[in-house]
Amino acid sequence: MASSVRAPSGSVIAVASSSSSAALAGVCGTGSPCAACKFLRRKCQPDCVFAPYFPPDNPQKFVRVHRVFGASNVTKLMNEIHPLQREDAMNSLAYEADMRIRDPVYGCVGVISILQHNLRQLQQDLARAKYELSKYQAAAAASASTAPTGPQAMAEFIGSAMPNGAAHNFINLGHSAALGSLGGSTAMFGQQEQFGSNAQMLSRSYDGGEPIARIGMNNGGYEFGYSSATTMGGSAGAVSGGLGTLGISSPPFLKSGTAGGDEKPSGGY
């Protein structure tokens, strides 16, 4: 019962009796019993273990759990686990019960097997893709490390740009030209060396070791003279012999090769 008490300010305060409080306590916090108590047709107590996990707006959740596992087994399980783990446990029981109703033989095990098979297939595909990628990366690294640089790259570029045989002929031509140039230089050096030895032979003295003839290397000039008047005859013969050694016939007069030089008569004329 409820009684009213008049306050000093004139307002009325209603006070509920103990019987009314007990009646309100039998109803859940939302004003209606939970899905478990409603399905079991019992009074929902304030400490009902099903009320937090089986709300009245989803009655089929408890119906499936009760059908597969039983309300007594669910109550026993909830009393054995920690209160913080009860929500996950009730959601797991609800999922397993739903899968068992859909597939009475395998239940959730069949779904788990399918998911595991898909996971293994994806792992194999990923490993295969990584293997193919590693092969491409290794080939790219090998080609980059063995790529020709400098003269070798230029030679390969010339060889690829020229027709077949053209590069070989080009190399042979350059080799022949180099040998010809080297041979010409050698021949010229040999001629100069032979001319120098003949000049030394001509400048050798035939009268007491004194030089009586000299051929100038500049402008191809030459000079001729005697060491003394008494030996002119013998010296002329010696010089004539020296010119014969060079393969040059004795002219009637020998002239100086330098510009503006005086003419010197031969000893024999």
From Swiss-Prot:
The keyword Nucleus applies. InterPro entries: LOB. One of its GO terms (cellular component) is nucleus. The keyword Acyltransferase does not apply. It comes from the Eukaryota. Keywords: Developmental protein, Nucleus. Residues 32-133 form the LOB domain. It is found in: Nucleus. Its main location: nucleus. Pfam families: LOB. Expressed in leaves, leaf primordia, immature ears, immature tassels, whole ovules, silk and husk leaves. PANTHER family: LOB DOMAIN-CONTAINING PROTEIN 4-RELATED, PROTEIN ASYMMETRIC LEAVES 2. Belongs to the LOB domain-containing protein family. Might be partially redundant with the LBD6/AS2/IG1 gene. This is Protein IAL1.
